């Protein structure tokens, strides 16, 4: 096999590849063995049709596409290795010559990884983040904990207030007609939660149990149901019950209920302070790491191929789809609820995709420039750390990873970011 690489404009080039006739014939033979298994011919068992009879009836050319499917991936893979290039998208293949007993000649138009011209990446000035925890921070965290342990109790007297939960019946009408999905009974609505259409919850404030009211609202212009978007609506609402939050008293008993590891309220406050300090420190470290990476990426010169951005967008959509599935939703439902589609979603994600690609390319360039390596011992230590974190045997982690190559690359990236932080101003 012979391969010739010709660089064109930008990050595109053409590989001209020639494969020996012997390999071509071998691929045609392999194609015949595959195809003949599917053919029934009177007088022969299935898959036992003689080759000469096959070629007489169907022609050797009928095997060419299957033969190409066999030979092209191998030839293309060997050619890019020989040329020392790094494709970032599927090639555009053009077959110039393919026939029995002759060399295969084809071209592959390839988009390759762009050259990265690193700018300043050492001595980057980053803002130091305040990590001090105040008494007010601790009190706010304690109050949040108190809120989470609050109980809803029926308000026997009084009216609906912000923060209450109103148990209601409701039915919505647009142009005097009830609409699908606009009716509910004994629905518990937290006032101030923003669960319903803007303006709905506020109009329930001041109502007593047993009272009814016509609530006038307008659906948002971007509402997921296109037939309702932007339209005024009337909801007939009846309040059946009002519940209010009853906060537990802040004392030692509360502390023990909130955290079995403490015995007093003072101990709980001390633990909350420690947790807040660790959280702020962790947050500050992440902020510095993000900032140095973004600065290094901004200082670099890169002509990013659109194909790389498209690939990253596809990856981001898959990640988003996985997150939706964890919430019991899928992309189609998401599109219905948000009034968007696949193209709009990708457009929303495009800026982040460009940023991701740029950062990845810059970190790869820094790894190369600084000769950052990862030892086998470091990979093993990371696998053991993962095993401890997930409560799994080391062998199970290795089996789940399949190959540790990707893990080693992740560790190199982590080291590159460590290098940027250590060398920041």
From Swiss-Prot:
Its main location: cytoplasm. It catalyses: [protein]-peptidylproline (omega=180) = [protein]-peptidylproline (omega=0). One of its GO terms (biological process) is protein unfolding. One of its GO terms (molecular function) is peptidyl-prolyl cis-trans isomerase activity. Its EC number is 5.2.1.8. Keywords: Cell cycle, Cell division, Chaperone, Cytoplasm, Isomerase, Rotamase. GO terms for cellular component: cytoplasm. Gene3D superfamilies: 3.10.50.40, Trigger factor ribosome-binding domain (3.30.70.1050), Trigger factor, C-terminal domain (1.10.3120.10). Residues 163-248 form the PPIase FKBP-type domain. Consists of 3 domains; the N-terminus binds the ribosome, the middle domain has PPIase activity, while the C-terminus has intrinsic chaperone activity on its own. Belongs to the FKBP-type PPIase family. Tig subfamily. This is Trigger factor. It comes from Bacillus cereus (strain AH187).
